[in-house]
């Protein structure tokens, strides 16, 4: 959880060295924030199409994407699109209310991962947008520090990515059995 009441400098200082480098790295990419003020009907379907291309399948119904559109129109969400020479290469959706925001969904054409930290900068732009809109907290989602060998590599990388933004950490212990000390 990133405390948006902190200054930009204080928030940025909590990022890992690699994340700070990627945010500061110069690119020719264009980042566009779409909220209720500039969103055009059915633009969420551009994210849906990109998501299907990236995942090679349809993972959600069109109806769920249209729910995200309603959230945007009701000032409860926003999108960040990233373009390379007018071609959409990344899209992220964020839920928000008057108090907090949740990093909800994201997709990026994988070929661009090696070129630049696209999503690093997307998160930074989201933080700036949320602060400007008086949001207090930004939830990036779960990030584990311990992994078993059977876990999905992609999920592990996503969680490490989120963890490297710093912020408020809460400790949670997951076990497959109840320790003897707690039985009885």
Q: What is the predicted function of each stretch?
A:
Residues 1-112, 129:
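A conserved beta-strand-loop-helix scaffold within acyl/acetyltransferase catalytic domains
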Residues 76-181:
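Aromatic (often tryptophan-rich) hydrophobic motifs at membrane interfaces
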């Amino acid at each position: 959880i990133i405390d948006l009441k902190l200054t930009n400098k204080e928030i940025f200082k909590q990022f890992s060295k690699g994340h700070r480098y990627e945010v500061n790295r110069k690119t020719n990419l264009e980042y566009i924030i779409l909220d209720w003020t500039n969103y055009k009907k059915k633009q969420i379907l551009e994210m849906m199409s990109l998501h299907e291309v990236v995942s090679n399948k349809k993972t959600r119904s069109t109806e769920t994407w249209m729910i995200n559109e309603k959230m945007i129109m009701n000032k409860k969400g926003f999108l960040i699109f990233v373009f390379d020479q007018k071609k959409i290469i990344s899209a992220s959706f964020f839920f928000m209310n008057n108090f907090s925001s949740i990093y909800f969904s994201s997709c990026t054409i994988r070929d661009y991962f090696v070129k630049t930290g696209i999503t690093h900068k997307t998160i930074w732009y989201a933080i700036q947008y949320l602060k400007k809109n008086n949001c207090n907290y930004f939830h990036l989602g779960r990030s584990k520090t311990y992994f078993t060998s059977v876990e999905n590599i992609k999920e592990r990388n996503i969680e490490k990515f989120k963890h490297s933004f710093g912020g408020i950490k809460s400790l949670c212990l997951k076990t497959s059995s109840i320790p003897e000390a707690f039985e009885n």
